[in-house]
């Protein structure tokens, strides 16, 4: 417990709120342009194809893209769902939300908006993947 003299000398510092998605700048989503899309197969690792592999206990080839946001930040965003059509220069919508087993990936691409199409043949949990209700 500080003395009154110590409190006069140095006031109490307020607890600063640190954002987990600084590139969004307080907005729920941001538009951006893909500068590079990382995907590919385990056998074929050519110069323009790279893959992001998850941390230790998991093993996969996760699909991510480098996105230049309208806020000026260049970020790495995860592409959820099976299959995607994102290429370089695709315009995408980015939301917050990290991927636990991919270090440095703190954003998700929103499927079903702008140039990112929804997941094909998805029946359950469609809202997260931009799929309309089947007739």
From Swiss-Prot:
SUPFAM superfamilies cross-referenced by the UniProt entry: Nucleic acid-binding proteins
Keyword match rRNA-binding: yes
Family label: Belongs to the universal ribosomal protein uS12 family.
A GO term for molecular function: rRNA binding
Subcellular location: Plastid, Chloroplast
Principal location: plastid
GO cellular component labels: chloroplast; ribosome; small ribosomal subunit
The name this protein goes by in its record: Small ribosomal subunit protein uS12cy
GO biological process, alphabetically ordered: translation
């Amino acid at each position: 417990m500080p003395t009154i003299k110590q409190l006069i000398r140095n006031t109490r510092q307020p607890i600063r709120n640190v954002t987990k998605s600084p590139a969004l700048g307080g907005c729920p989503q941001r538009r951006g342009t893909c500068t590079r899309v990382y995907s590919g197969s385990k056998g074929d690792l050519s110069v323009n194809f790279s893959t992001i592999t998850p941390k230790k206990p998991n093993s996969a080839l996760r699909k991510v893209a480098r996105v230049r946001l309208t806020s000026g930040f260049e970020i790495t965003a995860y592409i959820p769902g099976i299959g995607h059509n994102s290429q370089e220069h695709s315009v995408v919508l980015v939301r917050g939300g990290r991927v636990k087993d991919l270090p440095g990936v703190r954003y998700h691409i929103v499927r079903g908006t702008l140039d990112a199409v929804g997941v094909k043949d998805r029946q359950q949990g469609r809202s997260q993947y931009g799929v309309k209700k089947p007739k």
